Amino acid sequence: MSKLNIASLPKVSLHDHLDGGLRPQTIIELAAEIGHELPATNAKDLNQWFLDSCDSGSLERYLETFVHTCAVMQTKEGLIRVAREFALDLAADGVIYGEVRYAPEQHLEKGLTLEEVVEYVEEGLGQARAEVEAKGGYLVTGQLITAMRQNNNAQKIAELAVAYRDRGVVGFDYAGPEAGFSPSRHAEVFKWLNQQLMPVTLHAGEGDGKDSIRDALVDGRTLRLGHGVRIIEDIFVDAEDENQKAFGDVAAWVLERGVALELSPSSNLQTGALPDIDQPQMSDHPFDILYGLGFNVTVNTDNRLMSGTTLTRELELLTEAFGYDLDDLELFQLNAANAGFMDMDVRAEIIEIISDAFEAAAY
């Protein structure tokens, strides 16, 4: 299946960071306006710097690159432009529903309030949606308001998410370094979010293992697992007899309840999310094992700039590694659509668009 064909198919993006999806030229132009020094002065070299920095195999090193992207997202103009371009790039890649996650607390250095950050991001997303619609396209976006787990702002950010529930926000996210910063630190916040019926997804099973996933499920009350790739550490499959398999308690819980895994293949290889494999390749990613075992897998980009990727490219890489066909790709999109935090009527419309398009592509 060609890249062009995959690009033309409707897709759903659940795990995509706003501050990880900037255009290199935009970073350069916005940085010049505020006097922020960058490691490169042209778009090609800057793009390569991000790729090289993120191929270290360390989540901590990977996260350091966000110093430069966040630096140019501290003003009204910067946030609107970045959000607009972010969504337009999604639409250009065939995405019809995209959840846009970011941490408002990281965009306050120039005096913006948390509320202004959310409103300016929504303004940019709204501009993009209008442009796509004006050209006959279809794009729905939803903000995932993120609290940084290493900070102590979780309750404030949770209240922000709830306050903007009907103004562009669809859910709450919890990100940052996993090790040492368990969701149990903010268990009362997640209890409160649950009482508010606010959907929650937590980063878990990326920088830490199954205990982090357990915490996300128990104390975080998460509906989805941001990455969740290290659930594989709680599964045994005999290499010589695939019928011989065993699940630990955490893996069994996730499997039996259909908890969606927001897998981001290229990013997972970059950030050391497969710690037992030296220089892992896409064929080493446990995506196919998890899919074959019946886990609710979805395909995502995480940070398009840092991984030099798109959702089309992620699907293409998986197809090349594991031989997926059109039916597989459709199921991945339907999984994501069913796991999304959109309204029910929007979900039904998105599922219909996906089903119709994939049926047409089969002929």
What are these regions (language model features)?
Residues 203:
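Short HxH-centered metal-ligating active-site micro-motif
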Residues 1-198, 206-224, 230-363:
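Metal-cofactor-binding active-site regions of metalloenzymes
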